[in-house]
């Protein structure tokens, strides 16, 4: 990293870690020793190289054994940190509770550690005189099932995220601490990673020394069933798709399907121009056993898809834009990075104020590039956009909570289930953020007479300094300045009114769709995208009629705030038993809603929740309602232009 880029973060870190003595004055911990202040990180090389040897062969118990050797240069108190603020997660999610049997020795003698009482991911030890290194060992107890966390090891594959299985010395920038890792895999397994391999013999991979900053950003997917696909043959820098699967048959991708993924790489090059990596590795798990994931890294990404992703791609609509989204993050989020997320260590809190760019614009470009590449048709993308427009345009939560505030959700909610999602709002900066960028794109196209677009912003903002992968921070003012260079406007007001508005000022975010030549309408049949997607997931949608969604067992999974179901006192968890005297099914529910249209006959529904039964009568008569985008005659099809593949 460039020192100037981290100056503000260094000052913040000094305030955070330097506050320890003051905190001690509030109350002294009842421990057998004094806690030393955690040193603020400094931009100086850590003396020596930390070795980390990982054994991931215990598949039955899913236990990973880790051994580290950490050089030290003097006696006295020392703090080792377990990463807490994991890049890409946008919150303090480092699972320190998964670490067990922590042992630390020096010169063969055990050293007793004590956990820091304020920064509980920190472990303090006393380095004895004459010691030149600490030997650290522990077990990473990975989840056995999903109730304990995301499953990262199965009998056929594993997902190593190094930052979940390491300790590092406090007091130094992550970019200034060097690790030398090795990984032992089960016999016969192969792997993909952005790390540079020095050797791989008898199941032991030895990787080149790397800074902690990049080490934590370079996970591994490994498995018994592995395939690597070149997505840019003869290109300027390698782009590879590393696939692991539950079964070897799941690796059977057809050449036309692979070509669509190659077109994704081509369309990204045409959009951005520059590349900010020396090689890029998609890590892809085709599995229903490994925990689901879509997580960006600078030179790789972690992705998991349905087991039919290659063998029956038409049945995996929900996975279509995943790789595109994570690939875009190499430019937006990893190379260009919000300044308040560019922290010097993995334990300093990040701030999320620009996630509507980091994630929102990535969501936008991910869907656009997926469509331009042909992985998604224009018709299906318009259906997806209709669902997004309906969800956020009619969100009851807009009455009280600004979209800007939702950037804090990864910190305050951490993706826990919500009782009333439509009112609480969640990580709306993804999809509503994408609507804002569609608004900006169509406005630029309209005002410039079609001569300029958000593509020009992408080229100017991300398409410079080709080959550089030193993070380049950005601020709100940088965004505004670049937009103004593309098409003059009061962009600060344009953006802030959309980000900060609540209540009566929170207009439905549909201007981009209408300026794009379409309008949101509701019809009695789901659009093709929604029909296919909900068929995959076993979901049934009556959100815009009765205000409920149900699963394949007729159990209500969500209730829309202020809907007929809400007014009737229903919540998620109720099972629909019967409708109008007939056994419940999605078809029966839909038929009852249709039969009540335009008359006064109520819809009678019997429901069960545990041992409780109740009957509800809905005085609803507007029929089934599903979102669609309808072409506005006589207007330019700017959405069509946006989604069309680029030829130069």
Where are the language model's segments positioned?
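N-terminal, polar/Ser/Thr-rich
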Residues: 25-59
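Ligand-binding face of N-terminal immunoglobulin V-set domains in extracellular IgSF glycoproteins
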Residues: 67, 77-82
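Gram-negative bacterial Sec-dependent N-terminal signal peptides
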Residues: 3-23
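C-terminal recognition in membrane/secretory proteostasis and scaffolding
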Residues: 366, 376-648
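Non-catalytic architectural context of zinc metalloproteases
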Residues: 44-46, 57, 63, 67-69, ...
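Extended catalytic-interface subdomain
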Residues: 328-330, 357-379, 388
